From Swiss-Prot:
Subcellular location(s) per record: Cell membrane; Cell projection, Phagocytic cup; Early endosome; Nucleus
Positions of the UniProt region annotated as Disordered: 367-404
Protein name per Swiss-Prot or TrEMBL: Advanced glycosylation end product-specific receptor
Residue ranges with Acidic residues bias: 378-396
Post-translational modification, as annotated: Phosphorylated on its cytoplasmic domain by PKCzeta/PRKCZ upon ligand binding. Phosphorylated by ATM following DNA damage. Targeted by the ubiquitin E3 ligase subunit FBXO10 to mediate its ubiquitination and degradation.
Subunit record text: Constitutive homodimer; disulfide-linked. Forms homooligomers. Interacts with S100A1 and APP. Interacts with S100B, S100A12 and S100A14. Interacts with TIRAP. Interacts with HMGB1. Interacts with LGP2; this interaction plays an important role in AGER-mediated pro-inflammatory responses and cytokine release. Interacts with double-strand break repair protein MRE11 which is a core component of the MRN complex. The interaction enhances MRE11 endonuclease activity and promotes DNA repair.
Glycan-modified residues: N25, N81
Membrane-crossing segments per the record: 343-363
Gene name linked to the record: AGER
Residues in the Extracellular compartment per record: 23-342
Keyword Lipid biosynthesis set for record: no
Length: 404
C-alpha cells in the first residue's frame, strides 16, 4: 500500500514537472484580462477539449469544460473557440494551465502554459534625504522607497551614475521588505549610509533605481539628489594672520587680520576681542584703521558651520608702539612666533655655554696630568747631574796633587 502511494506521488510530481518544463511562459499584468489559446481545438462546437489548471486558487488540478457554469466563470471560463479567458488575473492565478483537445479527425493536441503575473510600482522616491554630509564620518544620505510591486524586485543606489556596492569604501545599505496582507504587493525600503572621503567631490549626485523581478522590464529611477559635503576643520587649521607681523603698530597705523579656513563650503567667520564677540557682520578679514589705545588687546576669529560647532583660532595681540620704543617681539599668535624663536635661541645658548665649560674642565685635567708626568722625569735628571758632579770632583783633586 505504501509502495503504491509512493508511486502515485512520483507520478504526480513527474506530471507536474513535465507540465512546467514543456510549458510556454506567459506574463500578465495584475488586473488585466488574459486569453490562453487551446491549440488543435475546433473553432466551433461541438468540441472535445478540457482545461486543467493548478494555481493559487486550487489545491490540486481543477478541470474546466466548455459547458462551464458555476462560480468559476467569474475567474476563468472557456470561450466558444476553446480558449480560456481570465477577465482579471491576480496573484492567485499564477500557476500551470493545460489544454487537451481533439480535432474532428481524432488527433489529440496538448497546450501547456506557465502563467506569471507582475505589477510595476510607481516611480521610486528618496525620502528623508540629507542636504549636507560631513567628510570622514558615516552619514545617512536618505531612504529609497518603492510601493506596490510584484514580484518584490530590488532597489539599487547610484553615485554619479555608477552603481554603489554595499560594504565597500564606506558604503552600507539597510533594506526592508514588507508585503501588504490584502493585495499581496510589496513595499521596499533601502537606507543608504556613506562616508565621504576628505578632498572628494563637494557635490556628489545620488540616485536610486527599482528593478522588477521579471526580465525585459526597464528599471525605474528616482530624481537625483545633490547634498553638499562639508569637511570639518581641526582647530590647528584655523589660522589667523596679522599684518604688520607681530601686531605692533604706531599710533594711527592700520592692522589687517585675516582668518584662513581651508574648508568647503566656507564657514561663517566672526571676530572676538579679549574673549568678547565683536558686533560685526561675518567676514574673513578684519581691518583696524587708525589704531588707538582703545584698539589694543587680544583678537581671535571663530569659524562657524551650520552642521558643526564653532572653532576658534589662537589669539593675536595688538599693541601700539610709542615714539622711541621698539615694538614687542611677541605680538604673536598664542605666545608663539618671535617669542618661541627667542626661547629656542636661549636654549641653544645655554647648551653652548655648558659645552664650553665642559671643554675647559677637560683641558685643565689634561694639563695637570701632563705636569705630574714631567715631575718625575725632572727629578731623575737632577740626580744624574749630581752624580756626575761628584765623580768629576775627585778627578780634579788628583790632577791638582800630581803636578810638578
Amino acid at each position: 500500500m505504501a509502495a503504491g502511494t509512493a508511486v502515485g506521488a512520483w507520478v504526480l510530481v513527474l506530471s507536474l514537472w513535465g507540465a512546467v518544463v514543456g510549458a510556454q511562459n506567459i506574463t500578465a499584468r495584475i488586473g488585466e484580462p488574459l486569453v490562453l489559446k487551446c491549440k488543435g481545438a475546433p473553432k466551433k462546437p461541438p468540441q472535445r477539449l478540457e482545461w486543467k489548471l493548478n494555481t493559487g486558487r486550487t489545491e490540486a488540478w481543477k478541470v474546466l469544460s466548455p459547458q462551464g457554469g458555476g462560480p468559476w466563470d467569474s475567474v476563468a471560463r472557456v470561450l466558444p473557440n476553446g480558449s480560456l479567458f481570465l477577465p482579471a488575473v491576480g496573484i492567485q492565478d499564477e500557476g500551470i494551465f493545460r489544454c487537451q483537445a481533439m480535432n474532428r479527425n481524432g488527433k489529440e493536441t496538448k497546450s501547456n502554459y506557465r502563467v506569471r503575473v507582475y505589477q510595476i510600482p510607481g516611480k521610486p522616491e528618496i525620502v528623508d534625504s540629507a542636504s549636507e554630509l560631513t567628510a570622514g564620518v558615516p552619514n545617512k544620505v536618505g531612504t529609497c522607497v518603492s510601493e506596490g510591486s510584484y514580484p518584490a524586485g530590488t532597489l539599487s543606489w547610484h553615485l554619479d551614475g555608477k552603481p554603489l556596492v554595499p560594504n565597500e569604501k564606506g558604503v552600507s545599505v539597510k533594506e526592508q521588505t514588507r508585503r501588504h496582507p490584502e493585495t499581496g504587493l510589496f513595499t521596499l525600503q533601502s537606507e543608504l549610509m556613506v562616508t565621504p572621503a576628505r578632498g572628494g567631490d563637494p557635490r556628489p549626485t545620488f540616485s536610486c533605481s527599482f528593478s522588477p523581478g521579471l526580465p525585459r522590464h526597464r528599471a525605474l529611477r528616482t530624481a537625483p539628489i545633490q547634498p553638499r559635503v562639508w569637511e570639518p576643520v581641526p582647530l590647528e587649521e584655523v589660522q589667523l594672520v596679522v599684518e604688520p607681523e607681530g601686531g605692533a603698530v604706531a599710533p594711527g597705523g592700520t592692522v589687517t587680520l585675516t582668518c584662513e579656513v581651508p574648508a568647503q563650503p566656507s564657514p561663517q567667520i566672526h571676530w572676538m576681542k579679549d574673549g568678547v564677540p565683536l558686533p560685526l557682520p561675518p567676514s574673513p578679514v578684519l581691518i583696524l584703521p587708525e589704531i588707538g589705545p582703545q584698539d589694543q588687546g587680544t583678537y581671535s576669529c571663530v569659524a562657524t558651520h551650520s552642521s558643526h560647532g564653532p572653532q576658534e583660532s589662537r589669539a593675536v595681540s595688538i599693541s601700539i608702539i610709542e615714539p622711541g620704543e621698539e615694538g614687542p617681539t611677541a605680538g604673536s599668535v598664542g605666545g608663539s612666533g618671535l617669542g618661541t624663536l627667542a626661547l629656542a635661541l636661549g636654549i641653544l645658548g645655554g647648551l653652548g655655554t655648558a659645552a664650553l665649560l665642559i671643554g675647559v674642565i677637560l683641558w685643565q685635567r689634561r694639563q695637570r696630568r701632563g705636569e705630574e708626568r714631567k715631575a718625575p722625569e725632572n727629578q731623575e735628571e737632577e740626580e744624574e747631574r749630581a752624580e756626575l758632579n761628584q765623580s768629576e770632583e775627585p778627578e780634579a783633586g788628583e790632577s791638582s796633587t800630581g803636578g810638578p
